[in-house]
């Protein structure tokens, strides 16, 4: 989360009743070279938080604690929210092998409460995978806030495997339960268990969980065509992305920056539709 959003969270006691939208200052893009990013965001609070989260998640927004945000870059629209249909997704041969390889894993669904085991795994994951990222300096209190500061229906999906006869936490995901799907807010896995392909396994299993809960979609976060950091998401077929105010198949995305936002005409990019009582 950027500093702008952290300050915004600290000021939330002064916020008006109806959702207000703000744009962060530009900063370097973490996905595309020589690009800058900015985010459109609003507070998530009050009695209508769940309805607002449901509505805006369908419009490409993501949650971080009590803030909803989506990219609103001046000259680029490459970042697109991605989701898979739980009923249409069929694991590939390689994904089926990953499922077989991890048949010993135990899934546990818990309330969003932080533990020492989670934090220790989070630090191991960040140090190995994102040592220079924006979360590298998070302490235990920051981690607890990330997990527990939610006023929507959130869960912690934990995965355990036996080590020396005892169950050990090897991955977990903070998720929101939407009216039409599961939104994967943040995922962590043991980076040293590469043979398990835990990142892929977790997405497949979240799809199985969505089917068990009769939910239509699994929301995966953002996807950028051509970004090596995002390539793994296109392996989940069919992948849908939100662009130009609608969900389309990712194979129809022709280039990384299809339509830049024209600030002089439309400050926020595509329209935003709020729940009827907002």
Language model features: what each stretch is:
Residues 67-76, 82-195, 235:
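A conserved beta-strand-loop-helix scaffold within acyl/acetyltransferase catalytic domains
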Residues 182, 186, 190-197, 213-226:
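Nucleic-acid nuclease catalytic cores
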Residues 59, 204-216:
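Conserved acyl-CoA
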Residues 56, 122, 203-206, 233:
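Residue-level preference for non-acidic, small/hydrophobic
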Residues 195-207:
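Conserved acetyl-CoA-binding loop-helix of GNAT-fold acetyltransferases
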Residues 3-106, 111, 216-278:
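Terminal substrate-recognition subdomain of acyl/acetyltransferases
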